[in-house]
Every structure is written in structure tokens, then in C-alpha cells.
From Swiss-Prot:
Region (Aspartate): 199-202
Site (Important for tRNA non-discrimination): H33
Primary subcellular site in the record, as a coarse category: cytoplasm
Matches recorded under InterPro entries: Aa-tRNA-synt_II, aa-tRNA-synth_II, aa-tRNA-synth_II/BPL/LPL, Asp-tRNA-ligase_1, Asp-tRNA-ligase_1_N, Asp/Asn-tRNA-synth_IIb, AspRS_core, GAD-like_sf
Lineage: Bacteria, Pseudomonadati, Pseudomonadota, Alphaproteobacteria, Rhodospirillales
Gene3D superfamilies: Bira Bifunctional Protein, Domain 2, GAD-like domain, Nucleic acid-binding proteins
Organism in which the protein naturally occurs: Rhodospirillum rubrum (strain ATCC 11170 / ATH 1.1.1 / DSM 467 / LMG 4362 / NCIMB 8255 / S1)
Enzyme class: ligase
Entry protein name: Aspartate--tRNA(Asp/Asn) ligase
Residues the entry annotates as binding L-aspartate: E175, R221, H451, R492
Similarity comment text for this entry: Belongs to the class-II aminoacyl-tRNA synthetase family. Type 1 subfamily.
Length: 606
């Protein structure tokens, strides 16, 4: 017989009755019925009930062992009676009558229970992550993650992609977030950076003649935590293709995503390929976001013309100063009490807007502050434009175009949730396309890249030389599912002269571009194919499939919201010797200078 087990805790069935078996696992739960002791033994695969009576030689051993101790049990498989069988367990028709028990590892008193559904503070869960990972739902999420990654790899390989590994230590580059820097001992005063993405390397792979690349790539960004973003590191399905158009990229990744979501999404419907393509300008108008949630049936509309020079002076004055008006429909909301409208108006003010005007369409006619002041024919034109009927309402956001778009998007989501309109049990995919190449920094007045600086502008050099930069579109695109951005991608700018010009418009002189991207630019000067790609976020894919609201629920050892690893106590201080080897002297805020004995005294390090 095997030293530890003949079967897992999920394998035994009625056909095993009468066999002598050995199981090993964790003591999940104990139930003492006086003369009988029941122990649920758990391993990675499942649960098996172990039983012994008071006359058994192992009774005292099992009675004394704590929950989550690791034990090995040898015994006989017996059938449960019809009354005691547990149809919810795969092993619920049998139990193991214990003959010998070996305690392999005794557990201390638990700071948090593994069995049961009790909720614990996140800091406790992350401090004792090894216990948290034993809990059924969390454990299942990690198994799901592993299976999803395996499926992604298989599907990419089936599409003709080959997996290559790119460097983890690289050079710092301006990709939109702060870099994690690694000091060089051999080159004092110089630093490596952990890659925010394998962007330049995968493009140079295309220049090197590799046609279809992919990688389950770790990415590192020093940015704040969000529900759908873990601080520090994340993983993405990074891929790149040569000699492709935008549609070729879409056609390559859509079947991979559809396949994975159908494989692991249960009975939830998945948008079939090809996914809807929504231009950025349309997305901002209709959805108030470049990450539209298509489960929300509401569609916003521009009604500026119906308020311009009209009787509702508050809006007409703002329109004259460059503002626009967005309308957000609220079907069936006419019967809502006045308090609901007042609460929405208060919420709008708390969100930084001036308020939230509305019109209620009743059988007797339109009602509300705007309807009292705006000419009836204009109110009717708005009703027709949004295809509203008696019993519906409509809300309005008036502001400068970008602010009006973003706020109307928030209103659209709030109304959808208040009215219970969001579709459930589905994964709604779309592409957001035709992003602007540039945007204006409102604080500095400087033109900046709005998305990926390595994207090819639509119209190429002619567009850069002849068009208003803010009117130039790029071959940039995002994959969105249920309002969550899974990936950004682009057809790349592979021509050095176009790249120099694109960066010049954003305020980067040629010398700085060469200093920051010299390796890639040199590669482009020796024959670069047109190429493009994307990089769907694996953590977010698993979060959606697991139906988890927080991305940390699908990461094995995540940092908390303050970018701390509570299990490993990272970040931590290092010794004076380590700092001196790296030629680093710390200049810390006074409140951070206190260190424990034996740790680094940063103000003394050279």
C-alpha cells in the first residue's frame, strides 16, 4: 500500500465498498455524536467522510486532532444508509471506517476557519493566504485560473502562434504608468525596469521574422489598486502578428476568447464572433464610455440642437459657451416617486455635476422643470429622437463635450441599476475602435498621446503633416466584455520617419525618441513588416468567468489595496550592506526613518 494514499478524497464510490484504502488530507470538519465521531477529510480533489466509534483504537487520536491538521487514515470503505447518504458529495454514498490514523502535521489554533462561509477582513485573509486558499471557493478560482491559462495556450497554438519568453529586466520607457526600478550593482547609478508590457520586444520579434508570437506575460506597473486592477503585477495573453490588418488581428483572437468563455462560462451566453465594432466617438456618445457595457440596454443621445437658443436658459447659455447636452433615457420611470428624482439630482451634485435635469412623459403630457420652460415642440422632438412614450422619463447632462460624455455614462449606469434593466447570465463582447491618436492635456495645453504611442495613425504621414492632431484617428482598439476592458491593442507604427513625426507632435524631440526607443528604432531601419497585436488581461478574464467583483479573488498571492504583500511582508527594508553594494543612499521622510534593530538605517547608507 502507498505510504500516503491509495485514493484521493474524491475518488471512492459504492463499487469500492469492502476495500481497504488509505487517504491523506486535512481535517476539514469534525462532528462528535458521543459514541461515533465523524471527520470530513479534505484534499485538493474533494471530501470523504471518515467514521470511528468510541471503541476504536483511533478514536482518541481523531478526537484530539485539530481542524486543518494533516492526517493519513487507513480503513475500510462501507456503504452509507439511504438516510445518511449525502447526494451533494461525489463520495456521499460511502464512508471510510477508520482502522489506523497517523497525524502527519498538527495544526495550531486557527486564526480563521477554512470550513464554512464566514467572511473575514481582507487583511486577515491575505496574511493567512495559505489558509484562505484552502477555502472551497477561493481554491476553485485558482483551479479555474490554471485551466483557463492552459486553454488559452492551446487555442493560441492551434491558431498557429508560438510562445516565446521576453526579458523581465529591461529599460525604463514612458508607457503610461510608473515603472518598478531595479538598481544595477555592476553599473552604479543606473537602473533596470520591470516591463510594463513586452511591447518593444514583441515588436522586435516581428522584425526578427517570427510571424505569430504569444506569451502568458507578467507585467509590472506601479499604479494604484482598483476592483479590476491589482497593484504591482498582472498577467496578459500577449500576442503579435506580422503582415496583418486590424481585422486580421480581430479574426485571430475572437475565436480564442469565444472558445474560452464558452468552455468555462457555464450556461452564460457569449457574443458570437465577429464582435460588434464601435467607433470611439460613437461609444462616448451612446454609452458615455470607451468601455461600453452592452448588457445595459440604454443608449444616450445628443440633443444639443433642441436646447440651443431655447427657452431653458440654463442649458442654452452653456451651449453658447461650448457645452453640449446628452440625453439619457429612463424607460418606465414615469411612475417613480418624486423622491427618486431628487435623490438622483443629489447624487449628481455629489458626483461633481451641477445637477440632473429631467422630463417625465405622462399620459397628460410632459412634466418637470425643463418641460415647463422648454418649448413644447422641442420637448416633442427630444421624445421622438429617443423613441420615448408615455410612462418614460429622460435625464439630461449639460457640460463641455468630454465631461458631458463621461457624466452621462455614469447616469446611464445608475439608471440601469435603479430600474433593474441590466441583462444577466451573458458575456457581451465588443471592440472599441478608431481611438483618437492625440488628446489635449487640459492643465498644460500640451498635446499628448491618448493611447499607445506606438500605434500607426490612420492616414500615416499625410495625416500627421496635414491634419489637426486632435482629429487624427489611430489604428487602436480595445476588447471590452461587460463593461470591463480586457485589452488594448493596435496596428503598430513600424516606419521610423512616421514614428519621429508622431512623437514630435506629442512634444518629444528626435534625440529623446532615440534615447528611449533606440533599440526598436534601429530594428525598424533594417526592414520591418507591418504588424499588430493585443494583450487580453488574464486576471480580468478569470475574474469575469469566476463572477468575482474583485480581481484579488482570482490571484494566488495578491497584494492588498496599499500594494503590500501581507504574507511575505513586502515591501520591506534591506540591510546597509545591500544598499552600499548598490551605491544607494536613502532620503526618507522623517516619519519613515524609524527602523527596527538589525534593519537598514537608510540615512547612513552610501
Amino acid at each position: 500500500m502507498h505510504r500516503y494514499r491509495t485514493h484521493t478524497c474524491e475518488q471512492l464510490r459504492p463499487e469500492n465498498v469492502g476495500e481497504t484504502v488509505r487517504l491523506s488530507g486535512w481535517v476539514h470538519r469534525k462532528r462528535d455524536h458521543g459514541n461515533l465521531l465523524f471527520v470530513d477529510l479534505r484534499d485538493h480533489y474533494g471530501l470523504t467522510q471518515v467514521v470511528c466509534d468510541v471503541s476504536s483504537a483511533v478514536f482518541k487520536t481523531l478526537e484530539a486532532v485539530r481542524a486543518e491538521s494533516v492526517v493519513s487514515v487507513t480503513g475500510t470503505v462501507v456503504a452509507r444508509t439511504a438516510e445518511t447518504a449525502n447526494a451533494k458529495l461525489p463520495t456521499g454514498a460511502i464512508e471510510v471506517k477508520a482502522q489506523t490514523v497517523e497525524v502527519l502535521s498538527q495544526s495550531e489554533v486557527l486564526p480563521m476557519q477554512v470550513a464554512g462561509d464566514q467572511e473575514y477582513p481582507e487583511d486577515m485573509r491575505l496574511t493567512y493566504r495559505f489558509l484562505d486558499l484552502r477555502r472551497e471557493d477561493v481554491h476553485a478560482n485558482m483551479v479555474l485560473r490554471s485551466k483557463v491559462i492552459s486553454s488559452l495556450r492551446r487555442r493560441m497554438t492551434d491558431q498557429g502562434f508560438l510562445e516565446y519568453q521576453t526579458p523581465i529586466l529591461t529599460a525604463s520607457s514612458p508607457e503610461g504608468a510608473r515603472d518598478f526600478l531595479v538598481p544595477s550593482r555592476i553599473h552604479p547609478g543606473k537602473f533596470y525596469a520591470l516591463p510594463q508590457a513586452p511591447q518593444q520586444f514583441k515588436q522586435m520579434l516581428m522584425v526578427s521574422g517570427f510571424d505569430r508570437y504569444f506569451q502568458v506575460a507578467p507585467c509590472f506597473r506601479d499604479e494604484d489598486s482598483r476592483a479590476d486592477r491589482s497593484p504591482g503585477e498582472f498577467y496578459q495573453l500577449d500576442f503579435e502578428m506580422s503582415f496583418v490588418t486590424q481585422e486580421d488581428v480581430f479574426a485571430a483572437i475572437e475565436p480564442v476568447l469565444v472558445g474560452v468563455f464558452e468552455e468555462f462560462g457555464g450556461d452564460r451566453a457569449v457574443t458570437p464572433a465577429p464582435f460588434p465594432r464601435i467607433p470611439y466617438d460613437e461609444a462616448m456618445l451612446k454609452f458615455g464610455s470607451d468601455k461600453p457595457d452592452l448588457r445595459n440596454p440604454l443608449r444616450n443621445a445628443d440633443v444639443t440642437e433642441h436646447f440651443a437658443d431655447g427657452g431653458f436658459g440654463l442649458f442654452s447659455k452653456q451651449i453658447a459657451l461650448g457645452s453640449v447636452v446628452r440625453a439619457i433615457p429612463a424607460p418606465g420611470a414615469a411612475g417613480r416617486p418624486r423622491g427618486w428624482y431628487d435623490k438622483l439630482n443629489e447624487w449628481a451634485r455629489e458626483s461633481g455635476a451641477g445637477g440632473l435635469g429631467y422630463v417625465v412623459f405622462e399620459e397628460a403630457g410632459p412634466k418637470g422643470p425643463i418641460a415647463k420652460n422648454l418649448e413644447p415642440e422641442r420637448v416633442e422632438a427630444i421624445r421622438q429622437a429617443l423613441d420615448l412614450k408615455a410612462g418614460d422619463s429622460v435625464f439630461f447632462a449639460c457640460d463641455k463635450p468630454l465631461k458631458a460624455a463621461k457624466f452621462s455614462g455614469l447616469v446611464r449606469e445608475r439608471i440601469c441599476d435603479d430600474l433593474g434593466l441590466r441583462e444577466t447570465g451573458v458575456f457581451r463582447f465588443c471592440w472599441t475602435v478608431d481611438f483618437p491618436m492625440y488628446e489635449m492635456n487640459e492643465e498644460t495645453g500640451q498635446i499628448e498621446f491618448s493611447h499607445n504611442p506606438f500605434s500607426m495613425p490612420q492616414g500615416e504621414m499625410e495625416a500627421l503633416e496635414t491634419m489637426d492632431p486632435l482629429a487624427i484617428k489611430a489604428y487602436q482598439y480595445d476588447i471590452v466584455c461587460n463593461g470591463i476592458e480586457l485589452s488594448s491593442g493596435a496596428i503598430r507604427n513600424h516606419l521610423p520617419e512616421i514614428m519621429y513625426k508622431a512623437f514630435e507632435i506629442a512634444g518629444y524631440p528626435k534625440e529623446e525618441v532615440e534615447a528611449r526607443f533606440g533599440g526598436m528604432l534601429r530594428a525598424f531601419k533594417f526592414g520591418a513588416p507591418p504588424h499588430g497585436g493585443s494583450a487580453p488581461g488574464i486576471d480580468r478574464i478569470v475574474m469575469l468567468l469566476a463572477d468575482e467583483p474583485n480581481i484579488r479573488e482570482v490571484i494566488l498571492f495578491p497584494m492588498n489595496g496599499q500594494a503590500q504583500d501581507l504574507l511575505m511582508q513586502a515591501p520591506n527594508t534591506v540591510s546597509d550592506k545591500q544598499l552600499k553594494e548598490l551605491h544607494i543612499k536613502l532620503d526618507l521622510p522623517k516619519k519613515a526613518l524609524k527602523v527596527d534593530k538589525g534593519e537598514a538605517a537608510g540615512d547612513k547608507a552610501e
